[in-house]
Amino acid sequence: MFKFILKRIALMFPLVIVVSFMTFLLTYITNENPAVTILHAQGTPNVTPELIAETNEKYGFNDPLLIQYKNWLLEAMQFNFGTSYITGDPVAERIGPAFMNTLKLTIISSVMVMITSIILGVVSALKRGKFTDRAIRSVAFFLTALPSYWIASILIIYVSVKLNILPTSGLTGPESYILPVIVITIAYAGIYFRNVRRSMVEQLNEDYVLYLRASGVKSITLMLHVLRNAIQVAVSIFCMSIPMIMGGLVVIEYIFAWPGLGQLSLKAILEHDFPVIQAYVLIVAVLFIVFNTLADIINALLNPRLREGAR
């Protein structure tokens, strides 16, 4: 098992290097000189060759590309993502509070997605082929097909504006989490519930389940055996939903005026504030790699057959 964990962790590093290099290249995605991009982003009215040369020297754009990447990566490893092109403030100071706000929303939403997916998946699998199963799958398919921004808008109009039950936007207290969490749960639970249902159906069709049924084992005991084996899906759901939700919160945070990474990154994109964009992309990508690896390790701990297959 120790070798398996080391192998999984070792595989993370080349992925992080590739992702970080692609993130670094965001500075060069425009056709113009990065120095010109910075000056335009700062609202400089008259971009002269002297200003371009001064900016190139200030930000190290005269160095070879790989040297620039090395310097940027070493700084990023110390959580120093440079300074904002717009405000001149350290990016870490802007990213820090926004990251914590997004992380709290993401964790709460991931827990709700996991609980909802497990409940719906288990009930649907136990009632497969019956009205309850068909109803759950139909509703899940319908809700998954609805755009998140539309669901968010409907909830704001009816719950916040007309009924005046919950705040429409911002982060003013615990009640501010309710509407965004509901929208995120609706968007993702319908997707993950199908994975839980499929796993449960596969487990219910296993030979050991048929044997236990034939032996007269009580339904509750049988369910405990099946749920124990199906828990791997729940682990994967929780681990994978965190980076996926965090990376997909841009629209939700914008609609609810949530002071998080999504809104900050959207503003940075509109302003061409590349250091902020780089920090956002790198954080989300690294979290995705880390939680994916964590899910593999936990699943291998729960299922020795996965370790055998990875050798």
Curated annotation (Swiss-Prot):
Gene3D superfamilies given in the database record? MetI-like
Its record classes its membrane topology as: Multi-pass membrane protein
**Function noted in UniProt:** Part of the ABC transporter complex CntABCDF (Opp1) involved in the uptake of metal in complex with the metallophore staphylopine (StP). May be involved in the import of a large array of divalent metals ions such as nickel, cobalt, zinc, copper and iron. Probably responsible for the translocation of the substrate across the membrane.
Any one cellular-component term (Gene Ontology)? plasma membrane
Q: Which gene encodes it?
A: cntB
Recorded source organism is Staphylococcus aureus (strain Mu50 / ATCC 700699)
**What factors induce this protein?**
Up-regulated in metal-poor media.
Spell out the NCBIfam families in the cross-references: Opp1B
Concerning PANTHER family, the annotation shows:
DIPEPTIDE TRANSPORT SYSTEM PERMEASE PROTEIN DPPB-RELATED
Question: Which keywords label this protein?
Answer: Cell membrane, Cobalt, Cobalt transport, Copper, Copper transport, Ion transport, Iron, Iron transport, Membrane, Nickel, Nickel transport, Transmembrane, Transmembrane helix, Transport, Zinc, Zinc transport
Tell me the protein's name: Metal-staphylopine import system permease protein CntB
